[in-house]
């Protein structure tokens, strides 16, 4: 309620008056994040962030308490609201980071402070504020500056070149369907009528699993999830069992049938 140009507030509430509400919110999230010494997965990329996040939750939540971004909360406002959910019970955090122009990733990185980084892909989404895909990719990679490990598609020439130029100190788990020397080699991908069979080699061990999808985007998202699960030492038999039960994720712009 406003009286004489002033907002009346409840006397029982506490308020902070700050010069910049967004920066204050982000600083609070940074401070809150610093309280937790747990693995945190930071996911960025032009597409697939939410699906990878939700599938990782399906794959990993049976073994640990996970805090993750709600829906597609990956913006300058969404990320601090997501990070604020961290609690003493949390054993793993999974947060998305989305940008639309140069210079935005630094603030998201300071709030998320990921220990595990996943770059899903690089495409034309939000390209209008970037001079090139390479510039966009380099900006996204700043999220991983202090990560222990970075996961990406080693067959993507643009991403591989940008990772090499970025001088990241993190261990790399680059998966590949063509290069047997990559840390995670995808030896075979076989599409059936309603599922896909994927065989892989990791740490000189060969395994196979199925996913209930046949589209290329789902296969790519699955391989990013696979790399994260392997890094977190999820047993191969559990990966096989849980991959087969992956469920589709409702996304933005989904067409709903009217009633």
Outline where the language-model segments fall.
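Acidic, Mg2+-coordinating active-site environments of NTP-dependent enzymes
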Residues: 5-11, 116-259
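Short, structured beta-strand-loop surface elements
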Residues: 11-17
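Extracellular/luminal Protease-associated
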Residues: 1-3
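Phosphate-binding loop of NTP-binding sites
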Residues: 17, 23-170, 229-232, 258
